[in-house]
Amino acid sequence: MTRVRVHTGEVNAEMEDTSLDELSTVMVDNSCGWIDIFQPEEEETREFLGNELNFHHLAVDDCFEEPASRVFVYDTHKFATFKARDADRELDTEYLRAFLKDGWLITVRHAHMPGIAEFRKRIKSKDFKKDGEMKSEYLLYQLLDSVADDWTKVLIRKSERLDEIEDQVFDPHHVYPNLLENLHEMKGDLREIAKSTTPLDELVQRILRSDEGFVTDETKLYYQDLADLTHSIGTRLENYSSGAASTRDTYISQTSMRLAESQAETAEVMRLLTIIATIMLPITAVASIFGMNVHSFGAGNGPVDLMTILAVMGGIGCSMLLWLYMKGYIGKR
């Protein structure tokens, strides 16, 4: 069901619920304000926007389709459409459509948006009285600035999260799980933000173009300030993305080094075991042959015979050690 709310620019005034049928009277009785059409039913909303307000049918079509971010100046009104963050999930976005006509800002949306909530707070404040002087262009500036500020808050949270991951990567005393997955997730989140903020920056830049005729001289300064904000968001995104990539490369390098160290330790253990086995193999063979067959070789049970056998085994062991040393398997690094 279509929900329509109106704010006529009064300080501290709440937005009033109304209906599409009553909007024409409200707009005649007041010179400026903000009309917010939420979850519009297509048939009645098309009727109101197209027939009552005489908005261009292409702009009206964009209210019920997936448009591209753009601005357009028609004969009797101006139109802008851009992405704003959806309140349901942090990085989900929905298109917000804005019409400017005779001092009125008319927004059409299909979802709850933090940017709209911030704009609602601003328009109710006592510092917002300039909307009566600058009409709908100033209202649109405040709306775009609210959306940009909302993205700035998201970036602040991402920056804090990135700092936390960097601290974990460079912590020498503890190994944290899922760091690589967290870094990939961070990179993905930054890309998703860029998909919305880059078109927003391009939209503001286009609004400022003199050939568009979208803004008046008295509001141009505000849009220039907004352009600086949207550009800084893009710059911060690039910096965070580079930081995440650098941290990921560092983590992969550290992981590779730890793996190499582990493999080196394993190789050292295997080398030591191989040396021991190599020495013990001939000694074991001697012990096996002479063990129960000592009488077959003409030897007796006296200590001299035992010492002779042990001497043979020791000589073989020493010979193996000398041979391994000469080959460089032990003693030389």
Residue ranges and their predicted role:
Residues 1-5, 27-30, 164, 210, ...:
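Cytosol-facing regions at membranes
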Residues 276, 280-333:
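Alpha-helical transmembrane anchor segments
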Residues 146, 150, 157, 322-327:
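Cytoplasmic juxtamembrane "membrane-exit" helices immediately C-terminal to transmembrane segments
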Residues 127-147, 151, 219-222, 226:
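Long, non-coiled-coil amphipathic alpha-helical linker/lever segments
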Residues 103, 147, 156, 160, ...:
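Membrane-associated alpha-helical segments
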Residues 136, 215, 299-300:
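Residue-level signature of the cytosolic catalytic core of signaling kinases
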Residues 1-131:
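Divalent-cation
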Residues 114-138, 163-174:
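A short, charged helix-loop
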